[in-house]
Amino acid sequence: MKVKIAAVGRLRAGPEADLVSDYLDRFGKTGRALGLGPVTVHEVEARKGGMAAEGELLGKAVAGSQIVCTLDERGKVLTSPDFANLLGKWRDEGRSEAAFVIGGADGINPALRAQADYSLSFGKMVWPHMLVRVMLAEQLYRAASILAGAPYHRV
């Protein structure tokens, strides 16, 4: 199952970009044997039209994806093993691509949120959208490690 990350804004060179790149590379290597990956990142411009304009661009970026999952403070809070099981379930159902949507500073357009198949939250706190990319990349790698039985995830 391919994975797409559609996000508002450009991730410039720096620690966040380094972390995202590292975790997505790890996910690619670990996930390959599990039928997960590769990951593609589709960045859309932050727009003056706010959420509506960004939502339109994000919607186009994920068109055709079999699963669309928003990352939103109103979403479901999962444990890392539950997230791994969710990815495994989507893969086992034969879904060819799961797309994760990260909104801009104002969040995700309500119309796009309503169309999503799933909504995920990294907790009740609000996170900067650039940090959410790092957190998602790490959780994708952690999920692949859990599914592979690798020792990365310890409890």
Question: Which residue ranges define each predicted feature?
Answer:
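S-adenosyl-L-methionine/SAH cofactor-binding core of RNA-modifying enzymes
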Residues: 32-98
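N-terminal beta1-alpha1 ligand-phosphate binding loop
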Residues: 1-31
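Short hydrophobic segments within beta-strands
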Residues: 6-8, 42-44, 101
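Short glycine-rich anion-binding loops that position phosphate/pyrophosphate groups of nucleotides
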Residues: 11, 73-76, 104-107
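Conserved RecA-like P-loop NTPase ATPase core
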Residues: 5, 69, 103, 136
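Structured adenosyl-cofactor binding patch, chiefly the S-adenosyl-L-methionine
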Residues: 106-154
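Short glycine-/acidic-enriched loop or helix-start segments at secondary-structure transitions
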Residues: 15-17, 79-81, 110-112
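Short glycine-/polar-rich loops that comprise or flank the Walker A/P-loop
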Residues: 1-3, 37, 115-117
